[in-house]
């Protein structure tokens, strides 16, 4: 049985309850992209799946607040379609003309795509069940981003230490 995802589409009227829909994974992210492109001033709250943005964004715990953007910069966290139907939410680490290099905060490897493959900009994150987003424009996120991206040379060791599935011989008793 395939897992169903929930999507919340926030409207300009913040007093109304967000619209909730359920759909399969195959429909989910293309639907998000279509909503953002059709309504560029609205946001979509996307439940996060995967481990690529660890240690600060967790699988099935946190949510990204996405918005359409016409401009992207190094350091932005973006929703990108790196192959047809294959989406990632990763940080832009380099832009060279039309070529964009991405890396998940919890990854050591990179992905590449074109500027036209960037579908949305993460403008905030709902972490640890909170109802108030940590905005990417705020000091908390900027400090985290500056520190974590500069730690790339030792990230392999930090991620290993933070990984919840360490072999039992390495776990503290």
Regions found by a protein language model. Give the residues of each.
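Extended hydrophobic leader/signal-anchor segments used for secretion and membrane insertion
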Residues: 1-173
């Amino acid at each position: 049985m395939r897992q169903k995802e929930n999507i919340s589409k926030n409207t300009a009227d913040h007093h109304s309850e967000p619209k909730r829909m359920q759909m399969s994974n195959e429909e989910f992210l293309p639907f998000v992209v279509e909503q953002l492109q059709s309504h560029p001033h609205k946001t979509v709250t996307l439940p996060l799946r995967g481990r690529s943005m660890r240690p600060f964004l967790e699988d099935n715990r946190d949510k990204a607040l996405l918005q359409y953007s016409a401009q992207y910069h190094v350091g932005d966290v973006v929703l990108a379609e790196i192959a047809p139907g294959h989406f990632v939410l990763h940080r832009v680490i380099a832009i060279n003309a039309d070529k964009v290099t991405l890396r998940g905060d919890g990854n050591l490897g990179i992905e590449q795509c074109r500027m036209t493959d960037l579908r949305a900009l993460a403008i905030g994150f709902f972490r640890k069940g909170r109802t108030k987003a940590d905005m990417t424009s705020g000091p908390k996120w900027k400090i985290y981003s500056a520190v974590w991206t500069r730690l790339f040379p030792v990230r392999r060791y930090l991620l290993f230490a933070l990984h919840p599935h360490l072999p039992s011989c390495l776990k503290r008793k």
